[in-house]
Structure formats: structure tokens, C-alpha cells
């Protein structure tokens, strides 16, 4: 790809945001919900694992689609929900924690290759410091967003996330997407916990 990834940064854990509140304990409770997802085979499989009817849609269309009832909900990290003011057109956050969303600090590989070994080491160290500060702030922000949205009247559902994890993994396996992963990758990811 011609890039050097310096460090992953934590963007947030993706949660479900619903237009109308409902009792949600597991994926079966979301059956029939038209949920906005970014699109693509992986996102569609993930959404089906959540129990919803996936509705691919660009993020700029989500606020209007929620306000008119075109979709019943969407999923994103809490910071994205708040930045887009989705609490104005929704009633509930369902803390499914179905995906941890990273972003990556990267540099063009031709530029990286022009740096001295010392400058490369300094860039990597600075990226690590920045990622640590970001990650700590994002985790604290997520807690404050839940508290803030609950204070504004949004209902917060805390379902059994193990039920969602099991359903999503079954969907990935049956879709054939997991088979495309390098051998042992899933097991390595599971060990990160």
C-alpha cells in the first residue's frame, strides 16, 4: 500500500443507537430493526450477526434517515454518535460493544524510508506517546458520553454482549469471511483481551 503504520489509535467501541427504545437483551431482540451500516460484505455480516436488517448508508444521510424513520437505528462509536447529534433523533443506546474501532497514524512509505534510523525511532516513540494519551482520553470520553446521554433522557441498555459475540462469530463463519483470515489470526485477536 505504500504506507508505514506508526501506531494504532483507539477511536471507540461501536454501539447500537435506536430511534425507538426497546428491551434488548440479545440479538433476537433486534430482529427486524433496519440498522444503518457502512456497507461492504464484512459490515453486512456483522449486522446480520447483531440480529438486524442491515441498511448500507453514507454517514451524512443518517441524521435525516433516523428523523424520518427510513432507518430504525445505526451503529458507531459513541463519540461519532455525539458528534453527529444523533441523540436528537434517537431514544436509546444499546451497549453491544460489537466492534473495537481503531484508526491508524501512518506515513507515506517513501517519506518514512528517507528518515534516518534515529528519526524513525523518534517518530515511533512519539506516535506511541500520542496513542497512549488518545486511548486514555477516548476511554474516559466514552464513559462521560454514556452518562451525558442518559442525563439527557436516552435509555441505556446493557445486554449480554456474549450473546452478540457468539451470533456475530457464527455469521462470520457461515459467510466464509473468517476463512479468508490468515491461519491463527482469530485466536491471536482473542488473546488480546
What is each residue range found by the language model?
Residues 3-193:
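N-terminal secretory/targeting leader peptides
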Amino acid at each position: 500500500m505504500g504506507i508505514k503504520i506508526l501506531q494504532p489509535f483507539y477511536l471507540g467501541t461501536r454501539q447500537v443507537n435506536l430511534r425507538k427504545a426497546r428491551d434488548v437483551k440479545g440479538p433476537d431482540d433486534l430482529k427486524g430493526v433496519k440498522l444503518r451500516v457502512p456497507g461492504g460484505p464484512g459490515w453486512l455480516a456483522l449486522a446480520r450477526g447483531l440480529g438486524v436488517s442491515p441498511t448500507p448508508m453514507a454517514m451524512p444521510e443518517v441524521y435525516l434517515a433516523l428523523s424520518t424513520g427510513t432507518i430504525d437505528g445505526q451503529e458507531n462509536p459513541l463519540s461519532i454518535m455525539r458528534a453527529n447529534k444523533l441523540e436528537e433523533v434517537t431514544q436509546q443506546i444499546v451497549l453491544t460493544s460489537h466492534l473495537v474501532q481503531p484508526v491508524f497514524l501512518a506515513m507515506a512509505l517513501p517519506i518514512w524510508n528517507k528518515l534516518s534510523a534515529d528519526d524513525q525511532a523518534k517518530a515511533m516513540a512519539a506516535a506511541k506517546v500520542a496513542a497512549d494519551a488518545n486511548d486514555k482520553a477516548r476511554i474516559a470520553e466514552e464513559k462521560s458520553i454514556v452518562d451525558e446521554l442518559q442525563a439527557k433522557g436516552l435509555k441505556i441498555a446493557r445486554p449480554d454482549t456474549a450473546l452478540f459475540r457468539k451470533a456475530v462469530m457464527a455469521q462470520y463463519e457461515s459467510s466464509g469471511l473468517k476463512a479468508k483470515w490468515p491461519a491463527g489470526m482469530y485466536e491471536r485477536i482473542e488473546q488480546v483481551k
